[in-house]
């Protein structure tokens, strides 16, 4: 009850589960990595103490033969060899995902940190090696090309869009922008201004889900078919935009998210809004019929400018850019980029 600022009813929903939250898995990560059975299995594979890291993955409705997937919070851990020469105090390597440890999985109920199953396909030996060399992924360890001459973007006369609260207007476009823990950026009430008023285009534009099926029948891989939005949350996994994530003429917005227990917090610079020249004209025509006719221009072109609303989500070892692109000719494009 918003008027009286009080809770009027609370009903438990048993038909689904909320997204995985960091607060519930972080303690379990420590527990699993300290298990003597896990430490021993890693050592048999040549992964010494402090050089192994096991992380949880969602499992959907799999493993119903071992536990109730509806009323349990099941995750399955797989492990990585993180041995390296990064010079970091926290992790020995900056290429943590480069060396997966195959044939070892731990099924856990994070509700009470119960270890349901430890599956080791190479308990008797013969595991594939995971101690091969990797390239450390930081500037000091990588050879880089000669720097490019700078390509600069500037808008000396200011931007062409306006922001009023959560409403954005640009070149006749008007829309409401909000941010959701599951879906990330969401556009509402999108319309185009005309001589007779606002022409509605869409009530809502948003990504509903991202499904990532690995499609490997191996017993340690078959369950890896992730719903990145429903299980992890594009908004929850959104990372701060900085560096070269957005061009220098971008406007940044922070968003309000909440913890697993509902406490709000501000997440800085999760959205950027900018205009850019796509490098091709919005319209171009050459009329050969009038070539050579005095006083008639045979070539015509109009410069294009697009408006972009961008966010970036980092899910495991994947980084995704989600762009909503508005064009002057009335088109809206949705672009998802995996970097």
Q: Where do the language-model regions lie?
A:
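Amphipathic N-proximal alpha-helical interface segments
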Residues: 1-13, 92, 108
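Beta-strand/loop-rich accessory regions of lumenal/periplasmic or secreted enzymes
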Residues: 15-339
């Amino acid at each position: 009850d918003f008027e009286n600022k009080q809770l009027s009813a609370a009903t438990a929903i048993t038909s689904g589960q909320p997204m995985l939250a960091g607060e519930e898995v972080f303690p379990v990560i420590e527990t699993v990595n300290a298990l003597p059975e896990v430490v021993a299995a890693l050592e048999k594979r040549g992964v010494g103490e402090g050089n192994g890291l096991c992380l949880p993955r969602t499992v959907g409705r799999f493993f119903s033969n071992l536990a109730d997937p509806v009323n349990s919070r099941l995750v399955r851990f797989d492990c990585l060899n993180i041995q390296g020469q990064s010079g970091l105090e926290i992790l020995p390597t900056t290429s943590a995902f480069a060396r997966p440890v195959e044939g070892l999985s731990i099924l856990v109920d994070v509700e009470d940190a119960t270890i349901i199953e430890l599956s080791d396909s190479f308990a008797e030996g013969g595991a594939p090696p995971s101690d091969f060399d990797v390239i450390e992924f930081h500037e000091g360890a990588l050879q880089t090309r000669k720097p490019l001459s700078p390509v600069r973007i500037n808008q000396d006369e200011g931007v062409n869009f306006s922001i009023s609260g959560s409403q954005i207007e640009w070149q006749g476009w008007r829309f409401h922008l909000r941010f959701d823990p599951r879906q990330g950026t969401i556009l509402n009430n999108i319309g185009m201004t005309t001589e007779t008023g606002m022409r509605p285009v869409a009530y809502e534009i948003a990504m509903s889900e991202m499904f990532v099926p690995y499609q490997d029948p191996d017993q340690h891989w078959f369950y890896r078919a992730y719903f990145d939005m429903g299980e992890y949350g594009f908004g929850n996994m959104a990372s701060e935009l900085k560096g070269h994530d957005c061009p220098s003429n971008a406007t940044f917005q922070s968003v309000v998210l909440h913890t697993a227990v509902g406490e709000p917090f501000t997440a800085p610079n999760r959205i950027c809004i900018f205009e850019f020249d796509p490098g091709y004209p919005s319209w171009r025509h050459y009329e050969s019929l009038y070539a050579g006719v005095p006083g008639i221009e045979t070539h015509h072109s109009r410069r294009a400018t697009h408006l972009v609303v961008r966010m970036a989500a980092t899910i495991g070892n994947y980084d995704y850019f989600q762009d909503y692109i508005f064009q002057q000719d009335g088109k809206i494009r949705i672009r998802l980029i995996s970097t």
